[in-house]
Amino acid sequence: MKPSLLVFTVYLLWLKDCHCAPTWKDKTDMHGNLKGFSEAGDIDVDEEVKKALIGMKQMKIMMERREEEHTNLMKTLKKCKEEKQEALKLMNEVQEHLEEEESLCQVSLTDSWDECKSCLESNCMRFHTTCQPSWSSMKNTVEQFFRNIYQYLFPFDEDNEKDLPVGEKFIEEDAQVAQIENVFNQLTVDVRFLFNRSLNVFKQMQQEFDQTFQSYFMSDTDLMQPNFLPALSKEPRKKADPVQSWDIPSFFQLFYNFSLSIYHSISTTITKTLNAIEDLPKQDNDSNHGSLSSKTLPVQHRGPYGEFGQNLSECFQFHARCQKCQDYLWEDCPDVPELHTKVDEALELVNISHQQYAQVLQMTQHHLEDTTYLMEKMREEFGWVADLANQAPGAENIFDSTKMVPNIHEGNFSKQDETMIDLSILSSPNFTLKIPLEESAETSNFISYMLEKAVQHFKKHFKTW
């Protein structure tokens, strides 16, 4: 016997003793098991596919609910935008009217201002040495006094102009709304497409399902199946504060009884200030000229014209003789105080409408994020079944196992660690599973184990939308 033939014979005997290669009986048993696996697997795969189809049905129903909520939010957002634009339009109209009235007021007040200044000048003539060192500076002081009084009476807050919504703000908000709408619409299309693919799978396997399930899946009835819903993440998610109702009240009724009045508040302040000056202790003018120069207005009444208190306190105690100085604004410009009040009200209206719009916009954004999160979780759990629609119809079996051979680990010829099985669901391409030794064909849960691994394979390789 040649040495090479001897070595080959010894090698075959060694393989037989080690059971590293399957015997003819083993191969026959494996082939029989494959047929049994396919038949038993059809039953289990049927249930898994049914669960996934129910999940896809619930995904469709939930998306339809979310779509209706999104539509209501967008309608509310549109209404808020219209209210905000109307408030801004009103604000601009009132402000424009105020500017016109103030311009006319400046012209009509020229004579009144001259009368007031003349009255003060004549009554303060005897005190001009104490009021100011020179008469020219006295006139300048009186003119400055009137300018400050007018600014104090009608202070239009320049900062409010910065707070008003500008064109860039509207453009930014419109772009954000358009993006939300586009993302939600795309999500709706994706969910419908995924469900339609699942519907194709249902039609391929329709004869495998009972009549109750067929009726449910093809109907629009919202039949919740909590046992089949996905186990979504239990991590808490932040929710936007819900509004009381989608109905937005008319903003133009909020300030119907608005009682702010600049005229009354400022008029009261001026009256108190002048009365405080008038109540100063009367001094002997001939003997107390020096002391008069040291008189000052009370600190709390200096206001915007407190700088005139030191030397003009005695001059202004004659304001009763110059009532024109106190009433000229109300007589010649009666609409200006009211218009300032309306401007403040309109500005407040703009701010409230802007805040309301921002609140609804934030709710819409949160609603989109929550919907996307929920649909993604359901897609991850059930979407794999839609991938079966890519396979050609007409497969005889739902679940096929085409080949099962022992696997020998490299470098370890002493034992069989796992079995290699080629599987397919419907007409999907074959994929290979490695079955560990403890999950052998003789164990009762072998089919369940293979099916679980097959479903995991589909989920892992499921294409994202």
Curated annotation (Swiss-Prot):
Disulfide bonds: C105-C333, C116-C325, C119-C322, C124-C315
Keywords for the protein's UniProt record, in alphabetical order: Coiled coil, Disulfide bond, Glycoprotein, Secreted, Signal
Tissues/organs with expression: Retina-specific (at protein level). In the light-adapted retina, expressed in the outer segment of cone photoreceptors. In the dark-adapted retina, strongly expressed in the outer plexiform layer in the region of contact between the cone pedicles and second order neurons with little or no expression in the cone photoreceptor outer segments.
InterPro entries for this protein: Clusterin-like (IPR000753), Clusterin_C (IPR016015), Clusterin_N (IPR016014)
Subcellular location: Secreted
Cellular component aspect of the GO annotation: extracellular space; nucleus
GO molecular function: misfolded protein binding
Subcellular location, principal: secreted
Residues glycosylated per entry: N196, N257, N285, N311, N351, N412, N430
Leader peptide range in chain numbering: 1-20
A Pfam family per the record: Clusterin
Family classification: Belongs to the clusterin family.
Cited PANTHER family: CLUSTERIN, CLUSTERIN-LIKE PROTEIN 1
Protein name: Clusterin-like protein 1
